[in-house]
Amino acid sequence: MIIDSHTHIGKFLNFDLEGEVLLEGLKKYGISFALVSNLEGGEVDHQQKEIPILEQHSQIETNKRLLKIVRKNQDKLGALIWIRPRNEECNTELEKLIEENLDIIYGIKVHPYHSKFPFNDKKMFAYFKLAEKYNLPVVTHTAVDKDSHPRLVYEVAKLFPNVNFVMCHMGLATDNEEAIKLIAKLPNLYGDTTWVPLDKVKKAIKICGKEKILFGTDAPINGMDIYKNEYYKDYFNKKTNLSKEVLENLLYKNALKLFNIKID
């Protein structure tokens, strides 16, 4: 079994990620289940210039589209609710949407870079309290920029010990070293493999523990064959040299436990 804990759908800037492409890739590469968020919730572009407000999609609109696709494919997909803290609030409408779809919602997705909004800003705390209320992990993009830096996630994780946080990328565009050290310090901090070299994944497992790292890819950012690229191919070619127990934890058991996924 394989669970991809980091996938996307949506039309956003130069990305056009259809749900069918994601599903075809899962089938082709034997992925049993994937957690997915909708990129259309992005608030700024790749240069962090604000997207014209009339071209943006609201939190509710973004997540209703996601939930429609997930609902039709709930044996294969689970929803990560994308939030928009720059332009919107954690409001009762969002909470109602979550309450009504808890059977297919597995977490809350944060992208500090594409919101141009610091992960540790106090406005974010309402979202984290919502995550705590519904026992939903918070999955966040982490990178070298000031809004997404792993240190901010660590700071917040200390303030919210009852919420589990996943550092996607373990610090994109870094050597991953600081993120790995931070993940090891707290029981409610996790990392994923998205764009992380295998040697750093192994180091993270060694330092943080075999229960702390999740398999994720950003599929289908580069098409359905993203699983063949240099970062992920060894997981499918069985060339990781990880023990059976460690590999099973990485590929699916950690995700099953953290997100409370129930699949056959």
What residue spans do the PLM features occupy?
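Active-site gating/metal-coordination segments in enzymes
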Residues: 49-137, 189
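Hydrophobic faces of well-ordered beta-strands that scaffold small-molecule active sites
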Residues: 3-7, 34-36, 77-81, 106-110, ...
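Conserved, mostly hydrophobic/aromatic
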Residues: 6, 26, 66, 108, ...
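Mid-to-C-terminal alpha-helical segments outside catalytic/metal-binding sites
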Residues: 1-5, 16-37, 210, 223-264
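Active-site environment of divalent metal-dependent phosphoester hydrolases
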Residues: 10-12, 41-44, 85-89, 115, ...
